[in-house]
Amino acid sequence: MTVSFSMFQIYRLVWLSFMTSMCLSACIHDSVLQETPVVSSNIISSRVPRLFPRSTSSDYFQPLRVTPWYLLGENAFISQGQIRQLKIALQEVTQMLSSTLSVHRSEGSLLLNRDISRFCRSVWRAPNDNKCAYMQTSYQGEKCLDVTIPDFHLQGVKVWSDLEKEPRTVIEDGAGVPDTDFLLYVQVAQTQKCAAQPSVIAYASYCQQDPTGRPLAGVIVFCTDHLREEEYNQRHIIQVALHELLHTLGFSSSLYASWLDCSLAEYGEACSSRTRVTNTDENGQFRIYTPTVMQKMGEHLGVEGVGAPLENKGFPNLASSHWESRFFQGSIMTALLSPPHLTHLDPITLAAFTDMGWYKVNATIKSQLMWGKGAGRYFGLPTTCQDSSTGFFCTGSKLGCHHLHLDKGNCSTDSYLEGCHIYSPLIHGGECWRHQNSGDPDEIFHAQSRCFYSNLTKGASPNQEFRGRCYLHQCLGENHFQVKVHESEWTDCPAGAWIQVAGYEGFIQCPSGCLCLGFQTPHVATLTPTYVTGQITTVKENNVYPTEGIVQFRVQVEVSQRHKWTSEIKSFLLDEVLGVIAQKAGVQRCFLQSHMKEDLDLSFAIVGKWSTDCPPTPEADTAAFSLLTLNQDGAPYIIYNSSYFSTVSIRFIDSDPPALYVSHMLYSYVIGGGCCAVCGAAIIFALFWYKLRRQFLRVGSSYPPETSNHERPQIPADLV
């Protein structure tokens, strides 16, 4: 049997592969809004009901509970394994939102509203003002975008006679959805919108609001082609799902008018509608001018009185639902998303959610925005972006470094940048942290490598052009680090300086304000090859390349609600627990890995380490130590509320913090006898630990962390 493809199909497949490889996803939320009817609960325009009693404080805000409701489209041909991967991705996103946002919960199950204009043929004027007189015989229920809402999620239908006070029930109230603050319908389908724009991975909209204007329900549609095995990227699906869900929760142009001013609510006053959320600046650019947003913008740029600019591509006279790309590279809420490891939930976006009035934002959540930090009032304008001296924009088409210095970048532009050029990450081979990549002989690709501007050469003319190259780095303090070139010693690299490396001609530029931020001095291990006893073990490797820290620890989980513990439910619980621990420690969820056997109880061995599928972040240098100090300030427990498992308790089996395994360089003076002694001691310790574990733990099968890849980067033979 032969298979033929039309030129359109071939073009579409090539385009899809190209966009996927670039990890760029376009968002069409603003166009989807125009097709989504919204059902509201009698929202009061100027004054809204008090969100919490006069005497209460923020204690009445509780973690946001988002409940996904899965629906498959008729043309969604994906496997059960792919569906499970999607559920795991959304579970991570909902846990992230639950730890970030809190709401004032309503009692009972969530019941959505019916649209009176759909189910009612006519209404009374008096005395039963605006109450339904006759039901529409053609009424076929409610929809959320293209999704039909189940009747048991909806309120009932009642009709009134002219004068009677009691109505007649035509449709009973549904049971509702328990333990839910926001109901998310999840659809998988290859819709016309998916086919029209191959770069669209998913799109979403809200469709119901409560009396205060807060969205109650929405829908997210995942395009089937991006969920197929050959295209699937878990980190990218998580990124896009978070972006779209933030739209449905309130970051949407059609909801700006519903944002509330609750600054006086703590004194017992009712929240009021904000007079105006958006306005244009002197250049005609729409910006959000709300108090917390302006405060965070001022802290970010180093000036006062600046609003946050919104995307103007396609919306010359309207406010957009995205941040302007020229100002917010790396933000989760730009219209064109960068690769997941270069995109973050930023403080300006969190400030917007604070100013919505419906949410309390967790102040301990780590958020970052490096793009434009301290660049001043005129940063990001089309008239100023031609100045490449700021280190953010560039000119021409040179090979340099992405502004986070995790990747090499090519100086280029796109339709959202309005002629400005930035260093966009290379499509292939530019990740300095990926050891499989290769480059010039002096380069080192490794989890601890970063991109540096350099023109280093060995024995050749030093007049080469400066471009991005990958070298090892190690942090010594805040914005203080060393750099290592292939076959060189560690060299101090003062931030902002140009340095030379022994044995090479040329220079390296040491970036300032983007490496070793938030550094904490490692109190559990040193940067010299010394032996550390106790829970913390220093493993020495005979290699010139240091490896990233690997954390291993064990937890015991208890739940208050009984379940029949199938392997699927256990796996679901494990994914949830890993997400909670990651959020608590402030590390990426993918940093934590575990495994489980069907005959085991709820005790899990967990390993934290960077991998190819989990690239490091700018804070990667402190990720392991964040886990180490997770329970030092109190009892070794984490207790949280789960929508499925009720109350969940996570207990660290050892009373001390998790053990850290850190690899260091082995100096030439460490002789074989010392190595043998260490190996013998390790074997004795392993036997002792095995007996102790068999005696006291109900669950065994703990596994040691895999040794990180220490091999030298692969260098093509013609470059050696």
Swiss-Prot record:
Q: Transmembrane region positions?
A: 669-689
What is the top-level taxon of the source organism?
Eukaryota
User: Which EC numbers does the record give?
Assistant: 3.4.24.-
Q: What is this protein called?
A: Ciliated left-right organizer metallopeptidase
Q: Which cofactor does it need?
A: Zn(2+)
Species for this entry: Xenopus laevis (African clawed frog)
- Membrane association type: Single-pass type I membrane protein
Say if the entry is tagged with keyword Membrane.
yes
Name the PROSITE patterns for this protein: ZINC_PROTEASE
Leading EC class: hydrolase
Looking up InterPro entries in the UniProt record yields: Peptidase_M8
Q: Which GO terms describe its biological process?
A: cell adhesion; determination of heart left/right asymmetry; establishment of left/right asymmetry; proteolysis
